[in-house]
Amino acid sequence: MEFLTSGKVKDLYDVDESTLLFKFSDRVSAYDVKFKQDIPRKGEVLCKFAEFWFNELDVPNHFIKRESENEILVKKMKMLPIECVVRGYFYGSLVSRWKKGEVQVPEGTNTTLAAQLPEPIFDPTTKSEHDIPIDKNKAIEMNLVSEEQYNWLEKTSIEIYKKMAKITDDVGFILADLKLEFGILDDQITLGDSIGPDEYRLWPKDSFEVGKIQEAYDKQLLRDWLTANGYQKQFDDARDNGQEPIPPNIPSEIISKMTERYVTAYEKISGKSL
């Protein structure tokens, strides 16, 4: 088995001509900045969530099997250069982009923070160091996907979001948004990468309230702490000056809270204990 590359969270290994191994680490990143500290058990939760969702969703995917507490085997495929984001709530970057006039929201949208959208929207981005939002025309113009592929990705991504939202709703969570990646396997568009709290926002229903920052059972907890303490602005300022942002130390209470919430989310949604 040959080591291929390290991503923000996963290490990839070449197993054979048709198989990859994903090793999930406890690493964490936010706002495209990698942090020095780990989040204990995060890799295990992401790994087992990937197994759960791939088995739960009725859509062709690259998952073969879980190999260990933090490793899965997947089929190799050619990934499509587009990140398929589905948003069900007026939150996150959608809010700032809407305020700048960079994106339209469905007619009748309540533009109060965290309000549910009338219908989930497909809001894809490029796949790059800093993902750039794109629309259908741009995706086709940039030769990222064909029109037929785009239409399929939009329809399927929204269907997956709705199914996942129903599953999370049944156990007391709101799935606010979701990021999916697809590839081509045997001439068929196939769900790839992994699905877990690094790919979606998850809010507990019992504390949900429109107009406020929501309690996060995902990576948003770290993002909110960074924003509240001025670090997001520091990162942006550093990049504007051509410098690499310097990650601060994450407080121990944020680290332990992230571990606790990741574990709780998995146990409630999957019905299995870790």
Curated annotation (Swiss-Prot):
Using the UniProt record, name the top-level EC class of this enzyme in a single word. ligase
GO biological process, any? 'de novo' IMP biosynthetic process
- Recorded catalytic activity of this chain's protein: 5-amino-1-(5-phospho-D-ribosyl)imidazole-4-carboxylate + L-aspartate + ATP = (2S)-2-[5-amino-1-(5-phospho-beta-D-ribosyl)imidazole-4-carboxamido]succinate + ADP + phosphate + 2 H(+)
Q: Which UniProt keywords apply?
A: ATP-binding, Ligase, Nucleotide-binding, Purine biosynthesis
Q: Which InterPro entries does the record cross-reference, listed alphabetically? A: SAICAR_synt/ADE2_N (IPR028923), SAICAR_synth (IPR001636), SAICAR_synthetase_CS (IPR018236)
Q: Name one GO molecular function term.
A: ATP binding
Quote the Pfam families the UniProt record gives: SAICAR_synt
Q: Tell me the pathway.
A: Purine metabolism; IMP biosynthesis via de novo pathway; 5-amino-1-(5-phospho-D-ribosyl)imidazole-4-carboxamide from 5-amino-1-(5-phospho-D-ribosyl)imidazole-4-carboxylate: step 1/2
Supply the EC number(s).
6.3.2.6
Against HAMAP family, the record matches this protein to: SAICAR_synth
Similarity comment: family membership: Belongs to the SAICAR synthetase family.
Protein's recorded name: Phosphoribosylaminoimidazole-succinocarboxamide synthase
Gene symbol here is purC
